[in-house]
A protein has these predicted regions:
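Short coil-to-beta-strand transition motifs
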Residues: 1-3, 53-54
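Phosphate/ribose-recognition catalytic cores of enzymes acting on nucleotide-derived substrates
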Residues: 11-123
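Charge-rich, low-complexity N-terminal segments
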Residues: 4-5, 10
């Protein structure tokens, strides 16, 4: 059975956009809902408003250590979507964990890994 998380898209630091992987930052609707462990996940995502039908996506839960982050964030990259989702409600179905979150030596090394992760979510 899929683990589902529903949340609202909120503003972030736009780091993903600057490295070619724009993300929607998710604030869970239910603050008491258990959040999966930090890491990178293959997920399906869709919007309550219907502007995104069920799409395969890549989600990170963690602190973004490559960029010296400290707060835990939930960020989803939807490969085939280019639009504004701020304020939208997204539903996320966790399919499988791809890897642990880790600190990369450079943003370029992170991008190289993200491209591998992207290939992995399609399988």
């Amino acid at each position: 059975r899929e683990y589902l998380l529903t949340g609202t898209v909120v503003g972030g630091e736009h780091i993903g956009r600057t490295i070619g992987f724009p993300t929607a930052n998710i604030r869970p609707d239910d603050s008491s809902k258990l959040i999966p462990a930090n890491g990178v996940y293959a997920v399906d995502v869709w919007s309550q408003a219907g502007d995104i039908n069920r799409e395969r996506a890549m989600l990170n839960i963690g602190t973004r250590p490559t960029f010296n982050g400290t707060a835990t964030t939930i960020e989803v990259h939807i490969p085939h979507f280019a639009g504004n989702l701020y304020g939208s409600t997204l539903s996320i179905a966790f399919l499988r964990k791809i890897r642990e979150e880790r600190k990369f030596d450079s943003p370029e090394a992170l991008v190289e890994q993200l491209n591998k992760d992207l290939n992995n979510i399609e399988q």
